[in-house]
UniProtKB/Swiss-Prot annotation:
It catalyses: Ni(2+)(out) + ATP + H2O = Ni(2+)(in) + ADP + phosphate + H(+). The lineage of its organism: Bacteria, Pseudomonadati, Pseudomonadota, Alphaproteobacteria, Rhodospirillales. Keywords: ATP-binding, Cell inner membrane, Cell membrane, Ion transport, Membrane, Nickel, Nickel transport, Nucleotide-binding, Translocase, Transport. Its EC number is 7.2.2.11. It comes from Rhodospirillum rubrum (strain ATCC 11170 / ATH 1.1.1 / DSM 467 / LMG 4362 / NCIMB 8255 / S1). This is Nickel import ATP-binding protein NikD. CDD domains: ABC_NikE_OppD_transporters. The gene is nikD. The complex is composed of two ATP-binding proteins (NikD and NikE), two transmembrane proteins (NikB and NikC) and a solute-binding protein (NikA). Gene3D superfamilies: P-loop containing nucleotide triphosphate hydrolases (3.40.50.300). One of its GO terms (molecular function) is ATP binding.
Length: 261
């Protein structure tokens, strides 16, 4: 067993109440530094809940029954994982920002939470925005979310996530509601971040095009369980589970094997 990454073991999540419904059951994943793991599955398969459960940020009405996270072989408290060890980019960037606060205010808030807010904060924020390809970062820092496009907001979310300097990044459907050109730019940005910083990236998606474009390894979810996992080429060329075959067949019918290793 490798000990140089982030491992999620035995994660089980259920609804509250006398008769709980299992939503995620016995999920195990491994995210390695410098590699991209795609967690893929149909809507409702448990992908986003898996991310939320691993980071101890589950929504109301559900609870984690079991599961642990190991970093380089050592168990970590889930409550302390987010921010220090794992940065996150969640769905729908527009809803992630307070509409009455500027991007500068959000950036300062992030730096304060990290204990890094000082007289150099403005320069740090400008550099962070430049690093994700936001043009005229000084102007962008003065904008509110409603003044920005979806692509700009997604880049801003990535910039704030990278301020944490965490070795792992969870990205939950980062290209949802973006047009194809902006999607490609965001994926290129994430790919570059992994290559340049050696981050381990877990990307949650239902889009096999994103998987083909970005992933090194793939884990397929169906009905709250991991039903298949392996290198991206193996998943596309030799899918074993019915859920995987359905996802691959739908993608191949539209795009063929273009871009798949």
């Amino acid at each position: 067993m490798r000990n140089d990454g982030l491992r999620i073991e035995g994660l089980t999540i259920a609804t509250l109440g006398a008769h709980p419904l299992m939503l995620v059951e016995g999920v195990g994943l491994e995210v390695r530094r410098g590699r991209i793991l795609a967690l893929v599955g149909a809507s409702g398969s448990g992908k986003s809940l898996t991310c939320a459960g691993a980071l101890d940020v589950l929504p109301a009405g559900v609870r984690r029954l079991s599961g642990r996270v190991l970093l380089d072989g050592e168990e970590q408290a889930l409550a302390g994982l987010k921010g220090r060890h794992v940065a996150s980019i969640m769905q729908n960037p527009r809803s992630a920002f307070n509409p009455v606060r500027t991007m500068r205010a959000h950036g300062v808030e992030t730096l304060k939470a990290l204990g890094r807010h000082d007289r150099r904060s403005e320069a740090v924020l400008l550099q962070a925005l430049e690093g994700v390809g936001l043009e005229d970062p000084g102007r962008v820092l003065g904008l509110h979310a409603f003044e920005m496009s979806g692509g700009m907001l997604q880049r801003m979310m990535i910039a704030l996530a990278l301020l944490t300097e965490a070795p792992f990044l969870f990205a939950d459907e980062p290209t949802t509601d973006l047009d194809l050109v902006v999607q490609a730019r965001v994926l290129s940005l994430l790919e570059g971040v992994v290559a340049e910083r050696g981050l381990g990236l877990l990307i949650v998606t239902h889009d096999m095009g994103v998987v083909a474009r970005l992933a090194d390894d793939v884990a397929v979810m169906a009905q709250g369980r991991i039903v298949e996992s392996g290198p991206v080429g193996e998943i596309f060329h030799r899918p074993r589970h019915d859920a995987t075959r359905a996802l691959v067949a739908a993608h191949l019918s539209l795009y063929g094997l273009e871009g798949v290793a």
